[in-house]
Structures are given as structure tokens and as C-alpha cells.
Amino acid sequence: MSGGVYGGDEVGALVFDIGSFSVRAGYAGEDCPKADFPTTVGLLAAEEGGGLELEGDKEKKGKIFHIDTNALHVPRDGAEVMSPLKNGMIEDWECFRAILDHTYSKHVKSEPNLHPVLMSEAPWNTRAKREKLTELMFEQYNIPAFFLCKTAVLTAFANGRSTGLVLDSGATHTTAIPVHDGYVLQQGIVKSPLAGDFISMQCRELFQEMAIDIIPPYMIAAKEPVREGAPPNWKKKEKLPQVSKSWHNYMCNEVIQDFQASVLQVSDSPYDEQVAAQMPTVHYEMPNGYNTDYGAERLRIPEGLFDPSNVKGLSGNTMLGVGHVVTTSIGMCDIDIRPGLYGSVIVTGGNTLLQGFTDRLNRELSQKTPPSMRLKLIASNSTMERKFSPWIGGSILASLGTFQQMWISKQEYEEGGKQCVERKCP
């Protein structure tokens, strides 16, 4: 075995899973991540010489990054919000480093050079970005060993499988990724932009139609309880800073995400006005005190995930619903391995936590599955496992005794350069 072998559980390895919505990080061998905070970062152009360092603020050459929920939620003059990722891949490296620094200092509370790092990556990550990341981790953070693993493979491991079709529906996209014997089959990846953010947009439009204002909590000084459907009675805070549009939008989105999780439900059969009208309504109160019941719209909004044709403003024919994403992906794989994929369709990602998501998916797939195949849907019942499955898979992998020879050690990196990531990390 080349380059220092670490002993099984005592590795103290760190696992990072950085998604478009949140950053999950913690020690391998534990059952849930130590850190779970938004990937979105507040950015302020710092004035010269001024500026006190606050909790969760990282200063970099004239820029102050506000990282983590608390720092991000403080309204500040002109602070923009940004994300280091684009399409699931790292785009803004300076911002990405600020997130790593924050994770090490505030959550892991340890020096980077003491811990090997296993990081998850998008299955379509490019070679240049993988090499740049490897270089960053060894050169800037001086870590002893490194490994990159595709999110879908980690998700499969977290569910005790090495072969299966991973359906990952997160914030920015829904993807079906076939995994065979621990390797991603690139030709079978199918992506669709219909995911959590798309649902948020639909909710926003619903509020516009119903003429409901979205007032984020940071603007509210006091509110009075009002009757259902009555106009809200609330006081605005005085002396609010001039916040940027992007930051205000981010705060509104948080209100919408809460609404999504509390109210929406996926209909178990294709959407039907009559059936939806009989569904029990759900009561929801906005932060400013406005409250009302939601009926058919609870089912109508998430329907777009499964049947894009009835969403107005979408060229419906080009988009694939969730069920189609799965069957298309399996259809692009070799015929001999299809039974293994139908036999374990693994559901993961925060967006799949919508009520009724898996039931509807099961129904759609059982209609589309060829009669010769056995369909099995694997969806953990625990919210934690569904949100964190790539992280949990990484935690399992990095603490396996047999994995210890897989690390790219510092020595190997120094001898072989950043190219070794292509060779060692499939």
C-alpha cells in the first residue's frame, strides 16, 4: 500500500458534502454531520481599515463574507448574496475557500493538516475543476490525504447498495444517475431543472395571484393576530439598512421554503381539479400575521414535478417529469444491468421530502416498468438520512478499513501532482 495507511476508525477523516442549498460537514464514522448551513454567502465589499470581525465573518482582500445562518440573516447596507456553486460545480473559488475556512474554524474546530478529507462532487464535474480542488486542498490546507467521490455513489453506499439508480432531487436540479458496482455510468445521467427552486417559483406566483405579500421576518417589528383572510396588521421596523435586492429575495425565499414544507403535498394520482377540491385544506400563517387556508393549490403546485405539461409558462414538451427522468436514464443503460437498476431506485435530496413524493413516484414507475422487471423503491423514512445521504455514505466509506489504501496521500500528490486525482478517484 502506497503512502501512509491510516488505521480504520482512528482516521479522524472529515467528510464534506457541498450542495447547491447547504453545506454538510463532519467527522467520518459519525451518523450525522456536525455542520449544516446554507451554501449561500453574504458578500460585502469591505471599507479600508474598518470592519470588526464578527462571528461567522471571514475577511478576504477587501471582501467580507457572511457565512452560516446567523451571520447571513443580519440585514446590512448593500450586502449581496452569492453562491460559490453553479450547476453543482465550484465556480467562485474565493467564496468556496471562505466556506472551508469557516467550517474548519467554527464547526470542526481543528487544524486542516490533521485530517484526511473526503469530498463529494457532482457526477458531471470537469477534470480541470477536480484537479484545481485537489491542488487547493493539498497546497492551501496542507491536508494529509484526500479523496473525491461522486454524490450518487455515496448515496448508494448510504443505502447499503453498490448498484442502483439514484434519483436525486435537490434545490437546483433533479437527476437520475445510474450507479453500477460503485461506478457512475456517465452515459445514463439525465438532468431536469424541475426541483426545489422551481417549486419555490411556483409558490411565488401563487402568492402574486392571491395578492399575498411576502414579508420576511427581518422587516417586522410587531404584529397583531388577525382573523383568517383578514388583511395583516403589522408594524415595520424603523431604521432598516438599505439591503440589496438579492439579499431581500433570499429572505423571501426562506419564507416560501417554510410554506413549501408545511403546506404542499404531491397528489398520489395525476392531478384532477375535482379530487383536489375535496382534499382537506391546510392552514398557514405568514410571518406578518396574514393567515388563510390552502386547498387545491397544495396539490397543483408540486404536480409540475411529475407532469410539466400543465405548468403555464413552461414549454412543456421539452421538460421531463420525475418519472420520465428515471425511465429515460435506465433506458440509456446496457440492457443486462437494467434489472439491477429497477430493483433499487434510491430516492434522495431535500426536495423528495415533499409529502407524498415517493408514493406518487412509485405509482408512476410501476406503470412504466416493463413486466419482466421487479421494481423496488428505496427511500429512507428519516428526513435526516434523505437530506444527508451523500454525507452519510462518505462517513461510512472513509471509516472503512478497506478504504484506507484508496486515499491520495500527501506524498503521492507531491510525487504525481494534481493529475493523480483522475487516476485514483473514479
Curated annotation (Swiss-Prot):
Domain of life: Eukaryota
Cellular compartments annotated: Nucleus
Protein's UniProt keywords contain Nucleus: yes
One record GO biological process: neuron maturation
Record-stated family: Belongs to the actin family.
Complex and partners: Component of the multiprotein chromatin-remodeling complexes SWI/SNF: SWI/SNF-A (BAF), SWI/SNF-B (PBAF) and related complexes. The canonical complex contains a catalytic subunit (either SMARCA4/BRG1/BAF190A or SMARCA2/BRM/BAF190B) and at least SMARCE1, ACTL6A/BAF53, SMARCC1/BAF155, SMARCC2/BAF170 and SMARCB1/SNF5/BAF47. Other subunits specific to each of the complexes may also be present permitting several possible combinations developmentally and tissue specific.
The protein's name in its UniProt record: Actin-like protein 6B
Gene name linked to the record: ACTL6B
